[in-house]
């Protein structure tokens, strides 16, 4: 009996120890889950903050871009060569990317993800968007033979639809029905906001004009979506390395554009003929805008970029009221309202 009593006490102690260990295990497991959840939440907050910062930066830079372009003109004309300005934009973007990489190498050292040297398989895809943008920019000069400037701004909104369609086809990303409705409303809102007394001429645009507008929209949409695919193919790759290779080929194709369009003018008048302080500010703005675009593609997507640039268009019009005595029409307020509804629908579609 004494033996059984002692044995029962031992069994009870062992059971208590087992329960204690189980309790500790559950506590540790719960703690690990809580830590993991906290880590994921913190990471998501950082990503949202990063997306918000680069999107706001792109919106502000894009809205000021049009104002600087207007200021850079004299008597309604560019006294400087647009192609040389584009070349300098690419050069500055390369320099800024290298500067950022230099700081990273100094602070973190050289790793596989931030190493500038790369393989041919990784680099060979970067010339494609540069070539697409070159052809698109060349078409931009010829389309004005068939449509005026206000009409061109309206036809440019075809980029919105082409980006959405190519985003679905190339990246295999689905947009919800609500998001598609928001996207179509965005195109309608931007078009409505740009309507004026001369807008009826758009319907009178000839077949070559419409063809060029559609081709330009497809080139722009494809280049943007393809660039996003390149940048996101290797998520861990440092964005500054990817930017550098994108901009190097962009510089090369801009050099080709100088030879094709402005070789005689540059040879006779000089590379920097007609440049002013405003021109230099415009070049800096374009360079920073380009970097902001690539960061939006890296941390967000082309859809966010389209919304950002569309909101920037409206912001430019509002600022122009104070700078250029620009008068906002009823169509602008109606279009702005439609764009706001579109932004809400896109956000609501994501939440679902």
UniProtKB/Swiss-Prot annotation:
It comes from the Eukaryota. GO terms for cellular component: endosome; Golgi apparatus; Golgi membrane; trans-Golgi network. GO terms for molecular function: pyrimidine nucleotide-sugar transmembrane transporter activity; sialic acid transmembrane transporter activity; transmembrane transporter activity. Residues 1-51, 103-124, 196-210, 260-276, 335-352 are cytoplasmic. Residues 73-81, 146-174, 232-238, 298-313 are lumenal. It is a multi-pass membrane protein. Keywords: Golgi apparatus, Membrane, Sugar transport, Transmembrane, Transmembrane helix, Transport. GO terms for biological process: sialic acid transport; transmembrane transport. It is found in: Golgi apparatus membrane. Belongs to the nucleotide-sugar transporter family. CMP-Sialate:CMP antiporter (TC 2.A.7.12) subfamily. PANTHER family: NUCLEOTIDE-SUGAR TRANSMEMBRANE TRANSPORTER. Sugar transporter involved in the transport of CMP-sialic acid from the cytoplasm into the Golgi. Essential protein. This is CMP-sialic acid transporter 4. It comes from Arabidopsis thaliana (Mouse-ear cress). The lineage of its organism: Eukaryota, Viridiplantae, Streptophyta, Embryophyta, Tracheophyta.
């Amino acid at each position: 009996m004494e033996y059984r009593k002692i044995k029962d006490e031992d069994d009870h102690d062992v059971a208590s120890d087992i329960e204690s260990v189980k309790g500790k295990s559950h506590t540790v497991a719960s703690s690990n889950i809580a830590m993991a959840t906290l880590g994921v939440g913190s990471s998501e907050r950082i990503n949202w903050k990063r997306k918000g910062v680069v999107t706001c930066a792109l919106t502000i830079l894009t809205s000021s871009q049009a104002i600087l372009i207007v200021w850079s003109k004299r008597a309604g004309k560019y006294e400087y060569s647009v192609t040389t300005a584009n070349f300098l934009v690419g050069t500055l973007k390369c320099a800024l990317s290298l500067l950022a990489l230099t700081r990273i190498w100094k602070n973190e050292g050289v790793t596989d993800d931030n190493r500038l040297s790369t393989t041919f398989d990784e680099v060979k895809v970067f010339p494609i968007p540069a070539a697409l943008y070159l052809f698109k920019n060349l078409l931009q000069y010829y389309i004005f033979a068939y449509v005026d400037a206000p009409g061109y701004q309206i036809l440019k909104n075809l980029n919105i639809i082409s980006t959405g369609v190519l985003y679905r086809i190339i990246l295999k990303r689905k947009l919800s029905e609500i998001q598609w409705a928001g996207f179509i409303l965005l195109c309608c809102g931007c078009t409505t906001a740009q309507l004026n007394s001369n807008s009826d001429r758009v319907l009178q645009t000839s077949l070559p004009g419409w063809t060029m507008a559609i081709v330009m929209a497809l080139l722009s949409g494809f280049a943007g979506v393809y660039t996003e695919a390149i940048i996101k193919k290797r998520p861990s790759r440092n964005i500054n390395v990817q930017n550098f290779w994108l901009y190097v080929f962009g510089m090369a194709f801009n050099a080709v554009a100088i030879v094709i369009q402005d070789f005689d003018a540059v040879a006779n008048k000089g590379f920097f003929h007609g440049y002013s302080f405003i021109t230099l500010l415009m070049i800096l703005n374009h360079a920073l805008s380009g970097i902001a675009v690539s960061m939006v593609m890296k941390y967000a997507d082309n859809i966010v970029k389209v919304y950002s640039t569309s909101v920037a268009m409206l912001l430019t019009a509002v600022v122009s009221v104070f700078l250029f005595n620009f008068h906002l029409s009823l169509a602008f307020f109606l279009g702005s309202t439609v764009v706001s509804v579109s932004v809400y629908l896109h956000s609501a579609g994501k939440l679902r």
